[in-house]
């Protein structure tokens, strides 16, 4: 018989908030007796943009900006209904994108 698992994928621009959210999820799942694998750090996506500083001339003068998207993966193995309810009631900070797959 195949075991059921819940895969939780977290994304955020700030790694401190992301790690705090991952810790809250792991603690909530472990309190209800579920096995937890993770948080596993996934590769950080870096988007870089170059913008010309002046509006008309001076192509050599550019500014570089980057956005870093940090990701974590948490697997909750063999969750009970109590585990799922505890995860749904969690109040996570703004700025953390959560994707849950059953």
From Swiss-Prot:
One of the GO biological process terms: translation
GO molecular function, one term: tRNA binding
Pfam family, one: Ribosomal_S10
Domain of life where this protein originates: Bacteria
One Gene Ontology cellular component: ribosome
Keyword Ribosomal protein set for record: yes
Alphabetical UniProt keywords: Ribonucleoprotein, Ribosomal protein
Family the UniProt entry places it in: Belongs to the universal ribosomal protein uS10 family.
NCBIfam families given in the database record: PRK00596.1, rpsJ_bact
Biological role: Involved in the binding of tRNA to the ribosomes.
PANTHER family: 30S RIBOSOMAL PROTEIN S10 FAMILY MEMBER (PTHR11700)
Subunit annotation: Part of the 30S ribosomal subunit.
Name of the protein described by the UniProt record: Small ribosomal subunit protein uS10
Organism lineage: Bacteria, Bacillati, Chloroflexota, Chloroflexia, Chloroflexales
């Amino acid at each position: 018989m195949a075991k059921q698992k819940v895969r939780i994928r977290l994304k955020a621009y700030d790694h401190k908030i992301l790690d705090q959210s991952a810790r809250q999820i792991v603690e909530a799942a472990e309190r209800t007796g579920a096995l937890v694998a993770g948080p596993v750090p996934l590769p950080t996506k870096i988007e870089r943009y170059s913008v010309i500083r002046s509006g008309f001339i001076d192509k050599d003068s550019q500014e570089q900006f980057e956005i870093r998207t940090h990701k974590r993966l948490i697997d909750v193995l063999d969750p009970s209904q109590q585990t799922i309810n505890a995860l749904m009631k969690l109040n996570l900070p703004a700025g953390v994108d959560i994707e849950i797959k059953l």
